[in-house]
Structures are given as C-alpha cells and as structure tokens.
Amino acid sequence: MISCLFYGKISLSITKNVRCAQNGEKMRTYLVTGGAGFIGSNYIHYMFKKYDNEIRIINVDALTYAGNLENLKDVEKRENYTFVKANICDKDAISKIFTENDIDRVVHFAAESHVDRSIRNPEIFVQTNVLGTAVMLNCAKAAWELPGGSFKEGKKFLHVSTDEVYGSLPDDDNAFFYETTPYDPHSPYSASKASSDMLVKAYMDTYHFPANITNCSNNYGPFQFPEKLIPLIINNALHGKKLPVYGDGKNVRDWLYVEDHAKAIDMVQEQGRLFETYNVGGHNEKQNIEIIHIIIETLQEMLPDSDPRKAHINNDLITYVEDRKGHDRRYAIAPDKIKAEIGWYPETMFKEGIHKTIAWYFEHEDWMNNVTSGDYQKYYNEMYEEK
C-alpha cells in the first residue's frame, strides 16, 4: 500500500528497504522533489512505465497551487511509490527523508516557475528556488559524504533548470543557447534559477559533489497548470474567452514535449558525465502568436461539427495585452552536447505533441475545471481581464 507522510502534521509509516521482486536486490530509490507538479508528475509516470517494479520513488511536494495529487492518481497505490507532503525549505523534513531512506538519486524539480508570478512576488521565488535548493544539497551531501570527503558510489543529484537563465537571443535563426553561454537572467524567476544553478555548480566544484544540471526549453503536455501559454489558450478557446497575447506576439520560444524531457532526465541520470551541464531543447521554435494560431486550427480539426464550441473558436478571440516586464525576445537551445554524448534527441514534433496535448485536455475536462477554480480565477482576472 502507499505510504503517505505529512511531516510536521501527521506521520505515518514509510516502507524501507524495499526489495526488487525480480532478483531480491535492493531497489534503486529516487527522491523526486516537486513530483506533483507538471514536469515532475510526467517524469514519475515515465519512470514507472519504463522501470515498473525495478525502482522506488519517494515524491516530496509542498502541494502549492500548481501541485496536484490528481496528477498521480494512477500510481498512488503502488507499493514502490511514497508521497511526502513537505516543503523543500524545511531542513528537518528533508533531512528525515534522507535519514530514514537510502536515497540513490535525487531529481530536483521543485521550484516556483511562472515569470509573471515572480514579477508580482519575487521573495517566494528566492526562498523556494534558492534556499530550497541549498537545503536539498546540504541534506544530500550529509547523507552521501564519506569520511575523507568522497561520496558513496552510485549517488547522483540532478538539478532541473531552465534556458531562461541565459537571457534573450537576437532575432537570428543561427543564434542558440549552448552550455557555455554566459548567464544573463532578466526576471526574478530566471535570476532565482540562475542562483540555484550556481549553488549546484559550487557544490560540484568545492566538494566534488556528484551532480548534473539540465537546462530545458519550454515544456508542454498533459497536467500543465493553465497559467502557462499552451493550456491557457486551449482552456480559454474552449470556453469562448479571449486569448491574451503579450506585446506583438512575436516572442520566440523553443517547445519541448514533456515526455521527451522526462526521457532526457532519465538518460542524463544513467549516462551523463558527473559535474556536467546538459541543455535539453525541442528544436520546435515558434512565435507565441504562431502557437495560438496552431491551437485554434487544431481545435477546429479535432472538434466535431456537432460540438457548439467549435463555432466560436477563431482568430477573433485573439487579444493583444500590455507586454510583460522584461520580456525576453527569443529562446532557442542547441541540444548538440546531450545528443553527442548520450544519444538523446527530441522525438515529438510540435504538430504531433500539440495534438496529443489537446486530446488529453479533452479527456480530462474535470481536471481542468478543478484547477481553474478559486484562487486561479482571481489571479487570471488580475493578470488578463483587468488589462
């Protein structure tokens, strides 16, 4: 049965020393932070699909607005899955997880991640993204370090970051972000992620701490909270609401289907050279306005003529709003290194990925309705309706 822990509130038993049914050997144990969020939950689904009962996953998540246990409903009864409700800034809670479990791998997703929210409330981004990462690093170091300063064999910490730390690229199709590109963050969010990246780099350099960093482009796919562009446009179009576009709509982003990202993270864990950074990009660069047109066209293709929503989904819904402060013009990742060293490449082209994403939201309208109620609606009104 599932173990579910609420540190600081209710403490239930946690299964320890789980054995692999196939050969009796100890399962490799993954500690996944932020696993109830968009990318984290997709990663957990991917890992269980690939490894089934060969691994054990402990998912720690504070369940803030974007964390949702509904994302993991189909894995919650697995004996090799444990959920822990805790904040990564809580040193005692995180230390307890390491003390009570032989953690082999840490996959650190947990972060505040929405640029607009960081502009409105930067302090929480510094606290979670910088302090929280420091707590995770310290607890992992304390658990894994051997006398003399070396580390236990087979341990690895993977810090999941963003291409936004690199700043903005010019409107030049030949300009890309590489692992050697200097950091130049322009928002409180990207500055907080750049700071957390630097902490991980410092631990690798100072302590020879076993870690990797991945910097990914914009993700899309199932379970994404609708403050982000693609689910926002899908949801608004289906409800006949305006489709807000910042500025002139010509900002460019590189889009990566979330399952491709999950695969990349697994491959870096298994094959990546320690202490290295790997850029993970989708080679799907598109202007924001182009994304909106593609979503409108795809909805028109997928909805039957009998669906009354089809009639009002058109370009008339597009509404240009005041541009975001410090809005970076273009992001584009060159994933050459991860392809050459590990053999990873993005498998999902955008047309296929957006079709799968829209199909998922069609099949999970209750999920969308649940997450767009309450506080989200208040936030949405402040961000878009009042502009």
Where is each model-derived feature located?
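Tryptophan-centric aromatic hotspots in well-structured domains and transmembrane helices
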Residues: 65, 114, 125, 177, ...
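N-terminal Rossmann-like NAD(P)+-binding domain of SDR-like oxidoreductases, especially those catalyzing
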Residues: 19, 23-219, 269, 298, ...
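C-terminal substrate-binding subdomain of Rossmann-fold SDR/epimerase-dehydratase oxidoreductases
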Residues: 12, 42-46, 50, 57, ...
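Residue-level recognition of oxygen-bearing side chains
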Residues: 93, 124, 131, 225-229, ...
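A glycine/serine/threonine-rich, flexible loop-to-helix segment
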Residues: 75, 173, 226-234
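Short, positively charged and aromatic/hydrophobic N-terminal segments
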Residues: 9-22
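Short hydrophobic targeting helices and cationic amphipathic motifs
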Residues: 5-7
